[in-house]
Swiss-Prot record:
CDD domains registered for this protein in UniProt: cupin_HutD_N
Segments traversing the membrane: none
NCBIfam families: PRK11396.1
Protein family membership: Belongs to the Ves family.
Listed name of the protein: Protein Ves
Source organism: Shigella boydii serotype 18 (strain CDC 3083-94 / BS512)
Ranges in a coiled coil: none
Short name of any one Pfam family annotated for the protein: HutD
Length: 191
C-alpha cells in the first residue's frame, strides 16, 4: 500500500507547456514500460494528449471547466466533472478547455493485453476485491483506509489485497479505480 497527498507530490511540466502531471503510481513500480499507471494532470491550454500505443486511458475531470475531447472521426465528447470517459490512448485526442480555465483530471492507463481499469465515484463505505489492484483519491470528506485517515486530495494505491474504505462523515466523495487482470495475467507474474 502506498499513500499520497497531491499537494506534496512532485510535478512534471509538459514539454509543450500546456500542463503538468503528478504521477501517483505505476505497476510494475518504477518501470517505464508499465502495465498500468495512475496520475493527476493539470491542463492550462488546449492541446493533444500524449500517445501511448497499446494502452487504454480513462480520464475523469476533477475540477475546472468542462473539457471537449475530439478524435478525428471517432468521437467528440464533453468531459464533465466526475464522469469517467475511456478511449484508446494510441489515437490522437485533442483537449479543448470549454470555459477557458485550467482543469484538473485523474488519469488511469492500462495495457490492453494485460489488464483493464474501471473508474467510479464512491459516496459510501465499500470493500475492494482481494485479487485486484486499485487507486483511491479523496474528492471530499474523510475516509478511513486501514489505520490511515484520508482527506481531500489524499489517496492510496495498492497492487492486490482486500481493503475497506469507510466514510467517516455523512457525506463524501472518493474516486476509485479498480484494476482487473485479464486471463493469464496477475500481479504475482510481473514482479
Amino acid at each position: 500500500m502506498e499513500y499520497f497527498d497531491m499537494r506534496k507530490m512532485s510535478v512534471n511540466l509538459w514539454r509543450n507547456a500546456a500542463g503538468e502531471t503528478r504521477e501517483i503510481c505505476t505497476f510494475p513500480p518504477a518501470k517505464r514500460d508499465f502495465y498500468w499507471r495512475a496520475s493527476i494532470a493539470s491542463i492550462a491550454a488546449n492541446g493533444e494528449f500524449s500517445l501511448f500505443p497499446g494502452m487504454e486511458r480513462i480520464v475523469t475531470l476533477l475540477e475546472g471547466g468542462e473539457m471537449l475531447l475530439e478524435s478525428a472521426d471517432r468521437f467528440n465528447h464533453t468531459l464533465k466533472p466526475l464522469q469517467p470517459f475511456a478511449f484508446a490512448a494510441d489515437q490522437v485526442v485533442k483537449a479543448k478547455l470549454t470555459e477557458g480555465q485550467m482543469s484538473m483530471d485523474f488519469n488511469i492507463m492500462t495495457r490492453l493485453d494485460v489488464c483493464k481499469a474501471k473508474v467510479r465515484i464512491a459516496e459510501r463505505t465499500f470493500t475492494t476485491f482481494g485479487s485486484r489492484g486499485g487507486v483511491v483519491f479523496v474528492i471530499n470528506g474523510a475516509w478511513q483506509l486501514g489505520d490511515k485517515l484520508l482527506t481531500t486530495d489524499q489517496g492510496a494505491c495498492w497492487f492486490d489485497g482486500r481493503h475497506t474504505l469507510r466514510l467517516l462523515q455523512p457525506q463524501g466523495k472518493l474516486l476509485f479505480s479498480e484494476i482487473n487482470w485479464l486471463a493469464g495475467h496477475s500481479p504475482d507474474q510481473v514482479q
